[in-house]
Amino acid sequence: RVVLAPQSVIDGLPLMIANNTIRPFEAGTTQNVLGITFTAVPAYNIRPEAQRYHPRSRGDIGVVMDVDGTRVYFSGDSEGTPEMLALENIDTAVVAMNLPFTMGVEAAAEAVATFSPRVIIPYHYRSSDGFSDLNEFERILADLNPGVRVERKEWY
C-alpha cells in the first residue's frame, strides 16, 4: 500500500504513519505506482480574496492519473490556474466549483472549456449559499465548448 502526499501533509501526520508507506508527492512531479502514473498539478486560488484558503505557497495539488493511456484529472481545491488550463489529452476531469474555496460556475466552465476534457464530472459544488447551479454550468460550457460532455454524479 502506498500513499502519495505533499510533504506538508506528511509533516502533519503522526511519525509512525509518516514513516510508513507515504511518498512525498509535490507539484510538477510524477510517480508510478503499480503501473499507474500519477502527476501532481499545482492547485491554488488566484483571486486575492481567496488567498487565505489555498495559497500557492502551501503546495496543494490536483492529480492526473494515467491508467493504460486513459487520463483522469482530479482538480483538488483549485481555481482555473495556468497549470490547469495547460492540461492536455484529459479523458475525464473531476473539477470542484464552490465559492469561496474554489471556482464559481462561470469560471469553472471557462477553465474546463479551455483544457477540453472529453468528460467533466463536477464535484464539491456546495457553496456557502447553497449549491452551485449545475444547469448554468452545463449551459455555459455548451456555449464555450460543446465537445465536452458533462456527467453528473451524486456527490452529496
Give, region by region, the residue ranges found by the protein language model.
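Binuclear metal-ion centers of metallo-dependent hydrolases, dominated by the metallo-beta-lactamase
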Residues: 17-29, 109, 113, 118-156
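Core dinuclear metal-dependent hydrolase active-site scaffold
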Residues: 24-88, 153-156
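Short, charged, surface-exposed secondary-structure boundary motifs
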Residues: 13-17, 32-37, 50-51, 102-109, ...
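Hydrophobic packing residues within well-ordered alpha-helices of enzyme cores
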Residues: 13-14, 84, 137
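Active-site HxH/HxHxD metal-binding segment of metal-dependent hydrolases
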Residues: 1-37
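Metallo-beta-lactamase
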Residues: 2-6, 32, 41, 61-115, 123-131, ...
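Short glycine/proline-enriched coil/turn segments at helix->beta-strand junctions
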Residues: 1-2, 15-20, 68-69, 88-91, ...
